[in-house]
Amino acid sequence: MEIASKYNPEEVESKWYNYWMEYGCFISVPDGRKPYTVVIPPPNVTGVLHMGHMLNNTIQDILVRRARMKGYNACWVPGTDHASIATEAKVVGRLAAQGISKQDLGREEFLRHAWDWTHEHGGIILEQLKRLGASCDWTRTAFTMDESRSESVIKVFVDLYNKGLIYRGIRVVNWDPKALTALSDEEVIYKETNGKLYYLRYFVENEPDKYIIVATTRPETIMGDTAVCVNPNDERYRWLRGKRVIVPTVGRAVPIIEDEYVDMEFGTGCLKVTPAHDVNDYMLGQKHRLESIDIFHDNGILNEHGGPYAGMDRFDVRKKIEQDLIDAGLMERVENYVNKVGYSERTDVPIEPKLSMQWFLQMESLAKSALDAVMNDEIKLHPAKFKNTYRHWMENVKDWCISRQLWWGHRIPAYYLPDGSIVVAETAEKAVELARKQTGSDSLTAEDLRQDSDSLDTWFSSWLWPISVFGDVMDPENEELDYYYPTSDLVTAPDILFFWVARMIMAGYEYRGKKPFDNVYLTGIVRDGQGRKMSKSLGNSPDPIMLMEKYGADGVRMGLMMAAPAGNDVLFDESLSEQGRNFCNKIWNAFRLVKGWQQAETATQPEASALAVKWFGYRLDEVKTELDDLFSKYRLSEALTLVYKLFWDDFSSWYLEMVKPAYGQPMDAKTYGSTIGFFDQLLRLLHPFMPFITEELWHALASRHDGETIMLCLLPDAHETDRDFLQAFDRTREIIAAIRNIRTGKNVPFKEKLTLEAGNEHDASFDAVIIKMGNLEAINRVEEKTSGSTSFLIGTLEYAIPMGALIDVEEEIKKLSDELAYQEKFLASVMKKLGNESFVAKAPQAVIELEQKKKSDAEARIATLRDSLNQLQSTK
């Protein structure tokens, strides 16, 4: 295979992705191998690729590709989420641009438009993932609203309802006035907001000269007040017992109630109770049997209970009522106040706590197994620091509001009979059967039943994802589930740890009796170089497709992963992608160098080459072992850095230089074969991180058959290394580096040969390497170094290079004097520590021994430096 002079990512990437698809390299079917399973966190069907997707899916692809190369039957299931709120908002917006409202169309026609939108946009992000190199089994692509997933969702709803875990009731919910739907607590984002604290006068009924002051941040809700609450232990308000007060502007008398829920230190210690518009007030209202007055329409406009403010927007009312209260003498004062306000995650408008009839799922009984699994490490979170967050959520779990006032989504399978009673069934036909049994009336037909108009929360389908992607959740004989479930690793963001991860764990134990996955890898947030979260509004989020066009997919993957420690935020800068592209070029050029060497079958292997081959073989095995350890701990960023340094430093900068034949000379066949073998192993280690360039070069490395691919090659096994040999070689590299530094410092060109003088303690095993890499005439053993030579220390051993007229004696004396002063100061600090009786008495023996070694090493260096200085000064 011909190799181009320059790496062209665009050409290489399209070629090999098509090749992988053509030969079905990503496809997984159950067989005798151990499975490795990952399900993609399904992106919104309306979405396009952003940097968070890039990070998440790069990590998944690395894990999946490495598992394939470890011999597992790797199955990565892709798919998309129907995203009820987001998709419905997009479709409503498109229709509005045409002057059409959702209500004008009706449900069925609106859903046709929604499906058209989904088919038009649903495949975009999946195609973009292919550009990244995602090795998903695309034959398994799932959609949370496709037929199979929908059947499972409806069956699970019916099952949970029949178990008594799903119920319908009136509760205060988080209401989105823009999307016109209820939200779960997890769909509300709290933001610090600059607001005001209003101190209002509530006059005592029939006592016009007496009033109490009530502090509130929401004066627009006073029309819904049905009580004022004080703490029974608050002496200030004992006189109010049994009395009633008048709600300002409304004129309605409401009772004073007492409850220890009230914080005596907040505001004035008097709390206005508005049961229909605050979850805590609702609980007080239930406890004290208060009336609930809902003053808002669904869109945030005040209804007929709003009195003179009916028909006005809630925030306009806040401004108007403030002035009206001031004018009426009912406002004591107004203070600036920073408050945490709940916003809809999807529409970014302040939510409205609102009394509403909704469907709920009881969570407490489901949560126990899910909590125990994580706390007992049956399911491991990486990093483990998120266990405390998880525990806090699960120990304070609330019932899940699962109904949404939307048309796009799984319609709730509840049917209302003419008498108002309910039946829940998988289909309308089954609902009729149930209704007939329930009522004893065989004359009931489907026309007599009315299906609930609400849809299920999107997460109600997503929580079944690790099960439903393999077929019917309720099928106990599901062979695919038996093989692939539980899945191996889940890669996701910490912000949906409860939203999604915890709920999947609950569903796993409820419907399979098993955990849904073994490990959860929690990524960080991708931020810019200034630490800001990437967002469209800030304009600091690069287009991933443009990045890949500029730097190549492998370059961008590498740039992201180099800065992505598990659980910590990623500070991404475009220069990281440039670094990734440069590494691709380094690999490419190293390959071209190696393939450009000629072989001589009969040539004898030089000693330096034999040592280099032995060293790099051991070093490679050492890295393989480290990689296994890092992957087991999900430290992928460190794993990539390790392989990067192995290739760039150890292989390219050292090994290739050590074995490189003289200009115009061939290489012996033994060294060449070893070098090609090393390159093959390096490409395999790099492949999970950089799939495209490694596939291209692996095919160029040797003749391959159609359908062969590096991704199905096994990773090379690690063998035992000789650590003494590696340590000795590290000292050899230090000697070579010191020689090079002297050449640079003295401006001695590399082509000019030097002589190295060493003492008798020097290990001559690697002299052939030192002579070649340092371009030396010889290495001489001497009792005393040549006068006027330049010396250096490796550990406690001194080496010298006779420089003759090349050396500046005064400059060398100054350099050695500075080093001597540093070593003497260092020795003094060690001596002081060892002379401290308290330190010696308390420090572990190993620490004391380390300090004693520092002392002896420093003393040896000082003696050597003094000797070198004396010799130099004698030449002056």
Swiss-Prot record:
GO terms for biological process: valyl-tRNA aminoacylation. ATP binds at residue 536. It holds the Pfam family tRNA-synt_1. Residues 804-876 form a coiled coil. Its main location: cytoplasm. Keywords: Aminoacyl-tRNA synthetase, ATP-binding, Coiled coil, Cytoplasm, Ligase, Nucleotide-binding, Protein biosynthesis. GO terms for molecular function: aminoacyl-tRNA deacylase activity; ATP binding; valine-tRNA ligase activity. The keyword Aminoacyl-tRNA synthetase applies. ValRS has two distinct active sites: one for aminoacylation and one for editing. The misactivated threonine is translocated from the active site to the editing site. Catalyzes the attachment of valine to tRNA(Val). As ValRS can inadvertently accommodate and process structurally similar amino acids such as threonine, to avoid such errors, it has a 'posttransfer' editing activity that hydrolyzes mischarged Thr-tRNA(Val) in a tRNA-dependent manner. Belongs to the class-I aminoacyl-tRNA synthetase family. ValS type 1 subfamily. This is Valine--tRNA ligase. The lineage of its organism: Bacteria, Pseudomonadati, Bacteroidota, Bacteroidia, Bacteroidales.
